[in-house]
């Protein structure tokens, strides 16, 4: 949780005068001080501030202390003295002075703010929150205080509160790239919580497999996505939408014939499946079968023209959304030849196809024009319907998701069933109304809040909201260090270390003091066993944040690789202090102590790490420790456990590899 911890501190320091603006009358003093004393206070205070501006912190410290000898209850001076200590990285002394300032004047915004910042740096988010909220009582329009409050909430793992805080800060600075980046990641963490909850609640369930499949699909790992969609279908053969989603994955992988078979399957179950009609029409267009493509799109337009356009990427759907992905270059060139035929066809579907071709060719103005022709040609006089539950149900059954948006607030009440709420949330999500979808889920009855179905849809909402935040970041500044950082994160998640390293280096070139960047780069370099380069970056991260658990752990591991446990140990001890619940650090500490011959300490750490052992490696290390201690029975038990886990792990891997190979080679598509 250290990824925002030193950011903007220097800027905050420069703004200190706005937070304090002290008078030269100590708190609690009701009568003016004698003129001589007052003059001395003014003189020392002015000298201290000048020294502080000149970065002569030793002189500033002496002058502030001289003021406090004359006026020990001068709260602002205690605070400024604390700041001088802070600028010299004397955090303990700084915090003492901030507390003294607050004891005299509890509402002092600057002292509350900086004390909150210091608790963030110590990893004590809950303590920081109280001080930062106090600072906001008097300085509610300061985005940097809101940013630090969000940081404290992140450290405390209160991601819901962090999201609320970041939205409040974005009201003050709507295009702030730091706030938008953090908002996207806060939503990502909430999504991961839901994924973990679903895995625990319903492991191997259809929804759990579907969520895994969608995750692999978004990372362009199509064979793994196919396997998990197939698993989901085995668990729930009749679940709506699964064949359509599987078809989309196959279509993006260029397996057009297989994709069409999946769309056909979905349409046999539901002839009005909008997604299947749109994608089957797209697949047939890719096959240059215009006569088969246009009827599907004509039918889709008749159901919901706005949603049809959204699925084809003609309406902005989100940063990295699959609907916005271009087809392969060869496919784009091939289908562009269909333009002449389509121009001779006067139908809404033909205009939609022309819009799709233009969008794929990067001609967005022409795409918009053709899309408007398609929409106007399809628009009919629809009798106005009242916003009743029956009418909303009818629209949901017909897949007319765009029609329900104006009715949602009227239809959703405390008496609305959980089933209808979830269906409305699903439709809102499909229509790009992510906040509306989440709100519908948040108001589910208590008994349904933790269901697998609710957890699945919340995870989907958080994923889309994260995407929307990152899209806003892209629009705010497409060349910013935050966007390079985001692209590095995405490439790292996809396993493309080379591209990720390029992006992180680009971000560092623009903002070398940004927390977590050096770690992200160093971690990938360490993963690629580029040890000297990795150490440079990891040490740079520790200059910014000496308590960064990831940087400390990786540095320790670089020395374990070189069999230098005496150098690894200090880093690993510090890493554990910063992240005591991490089993990997426990394992690495056990390894260090084992290599140093301190087997009892090694045993202690390995025993904490074994519950997270999935391949038998930790049990094996523990067995070796017992062997060294002469405890034969314990060693035999751990060796047996290690062998069993290792065999099971290898078996799973072989089966997974076999299935991936089968999926990859089974397609007959060119």
Predicted regions, residues:
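Alpha-helical segment of the N-proximal tetratricopeptide repeat
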Residues: 39-70, 87, 208-220, 350-360, ...
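Structural marker of alpha-solenoid helical repeat scaffolds
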Residues: 70, 104, 138, 172, ...
């Amino acid at each position: 949780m250290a990824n925002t911890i030193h950011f903007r501190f220097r800027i905050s320091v420069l703004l200190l005068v706005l937070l304090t603006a002290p008078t030269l009358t100590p708190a609690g003093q009701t009568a003016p001080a004698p003129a001589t004393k007052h003059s001395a206070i003014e003189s020392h205070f002015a000298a201290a501030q000048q020294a502080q501006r000149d970065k002569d912190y030793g002189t500033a410290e002496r002058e502030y202390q001289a003021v406090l000898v004359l006026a020990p209850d001068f709260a602002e001076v205690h605070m400024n003295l604390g700041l001088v200590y802070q600028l010299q990285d004397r955090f303990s002394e700084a915090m003492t002075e901030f507390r003294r300032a607050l004891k005299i004047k509890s509402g002092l915004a600057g002292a509350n703010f900086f004390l909150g910042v210091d608790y963030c740096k110590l990893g004590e988010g809950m303590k920081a929150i109280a001080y930062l909220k106090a600072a906001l009582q008097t300085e509610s329009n300061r985005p940097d205080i809101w940013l630090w409050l969000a940081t404290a909430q992140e450290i405390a793992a209160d991601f819901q509160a962090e999201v609320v805080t970041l939205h409040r800060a974005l009201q003050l600075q709507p295009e702030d790239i730091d706030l938008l980046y953090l908002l996207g990641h806060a939503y990502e963490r909430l999504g991961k919580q839901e994924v973990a909850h679903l895995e625990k609640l319903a492991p191997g369930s259809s929804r759990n497999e579907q969520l895994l499949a969608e995750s692999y699909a978004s990372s362009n790992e199509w064979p793994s996505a196919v396997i998990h969609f197939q698993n989901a279908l085995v668990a729930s053969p009749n679940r709506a939408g699964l064949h359509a989603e599987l078809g989309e994955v196959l279509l993006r992988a260029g397996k057009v014939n297989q994709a069409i078979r999946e769309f056909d399957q979905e349409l046999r179950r539901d002839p009005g499946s909008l997604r299947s009609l749109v994608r089957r029409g797209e697949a047939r267009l890719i096959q240059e079968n215009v006569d088969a493509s246009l009827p599907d799109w004509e039918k889709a337009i008749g159901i919901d023209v706005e949603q049809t356009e959204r699925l084809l990427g003609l309406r902005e759907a989100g940063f990295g959304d699959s609907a916005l992905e271009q087809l392969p270059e060869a496919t784009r060139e091939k289908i562009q030849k269909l333009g002449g035929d389509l121009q001779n066809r006067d139908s809404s579907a033909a205009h939609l196809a022309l819009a799709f071709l233009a969008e794929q060719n990067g001609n967005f103005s022409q795409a918009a024009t053709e899309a408007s022709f398609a929409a106007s040609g399809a628009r009919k006089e629809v009798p106005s319907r009242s916003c009743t539950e029956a009418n909303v149900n009818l629209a949901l059954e017909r897949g007319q998701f765009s029609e329900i948006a104006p009715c949602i607030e009227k239809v959703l009440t405390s008496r609305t069933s959980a089933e209808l709420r979830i269906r409305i949330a699903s439709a809102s999500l499909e229509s790009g109304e992510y906040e509306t979808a989440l709100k519908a889920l948040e108001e589910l009855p208590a008994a349904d809040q933790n269901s697998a179905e609710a957890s699945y849809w919340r995870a989907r909402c958080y994923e889309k909201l994260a995407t929307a935040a990152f899209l806003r970041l892209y629009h705010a500044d497409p060349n910013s260090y935050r966007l390079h950082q985001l692209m590095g994160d995405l490439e790292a998640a996809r396993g493309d270390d080379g591209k990720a390293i390029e992006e992180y280096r680009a971000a560092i070139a623009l903002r070398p003091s940004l927390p977590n960047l050096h770690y992200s780069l160093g971690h990938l370099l360490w993963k690629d066993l580029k040890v000297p380069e990795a150490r440079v970056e990891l040490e740079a991260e520790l200059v910014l944040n000496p308590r960064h658990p990831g940087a400390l752990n990786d540095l320790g591991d670089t020395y374990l690789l070189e069999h230098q446990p005496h150098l690894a140990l200090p880093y690993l001890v510090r890493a554990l202090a910063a992240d005591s619940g991490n089993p990997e650090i426990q394992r690495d500490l056990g390894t260090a102590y084992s290599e140093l011959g301190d087997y009892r300490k090694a045993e202690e750490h390995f025993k904490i790490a074994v519950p997270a052992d999935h391949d038998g490696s930790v049990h094996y290390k523990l067995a070796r420790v017992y062997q060294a201690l002469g405890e034969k029975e314990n060693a035999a038990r751990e060796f047996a456990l290690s062998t069993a886990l290792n065999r099971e792990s290898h078996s799973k891997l072989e089966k997974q590899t076999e299935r991936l190979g089968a999926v990859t080679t089974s397609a007959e598509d060119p």
